[in-house]
């Protein structure tokens, strides 16, 4: 995945519909929230929505729903790290006349909607393999109930498909990185995924029982303490 030090790196959805930067370094959190809402209006306008003098939706494009729903598998207890984000977004969108219902449901309800491709919007967390292959989640062969039905975004884009196949057939890390960056840009243009956080693993060991100098150096989610267990020393 692209890193902050890479040339051209920027945060996801940090420009408006015209490509202008939404945020600057002088903004506090409240100013950023306000700027993000104004930028959201530019995207709605590009999609065909019109707004009245009070800044609320006056009309929607043909075929657009009057309200939206996001499913969160919080078991009805708000037990999910993105619940607060979704409810804050709902309140913000309400101020411009867009209704976003946050539906906190059980895992089975959420899973049935996801597998049946009936969920309008949803939140989830997953982990990729050590080989960051994008085929399963984003290739059109797994969309619309086909293949593994694991492309829940239903994205069907020949250009994206070609990049995914190109990237997975090369063992050159730098080349794959450049190809996948292009693929990620297409995915962002589709607007089907909003990255929220990346979970980090933590390894805790007792220095009384373990010689910590024998733990693997620079551990990652894919190369943990078990990866070099044959050299691990205990006291």
Task: Mark where each language-model region is.
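Short, solvent-exposed loop/beta-turn-alpha elements that line the ligand-binding surface or hinge
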Residues: 2-38, 53-66, 113-117, 137-169, ...
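Ligand/substrate-recognition segments at binding pockets and active sites
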Residues: 4-6, 19, 23-37, 47-128
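Residue-level detector of functional hotspots within protein domains
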Residues: 35, 84, 107, 146, ...
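Generic hydrophobic/packing signal
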Residues: 36-37, 41, 87-91, 100, ...
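Sec-exported extracytoplasmic/periplasmic mature domains
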Residues: 41-50, 91-98, 115-119, 127, ...
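Bilobed periplasmic-binding protein-like "clamshell/Venus-flytrap" ligand-binding domains
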Residues: 47-75, 124-125, 170-207
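Short beta-strand-centered segments that line the small-molecule binding cleft or hinge
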Residues: 132-135
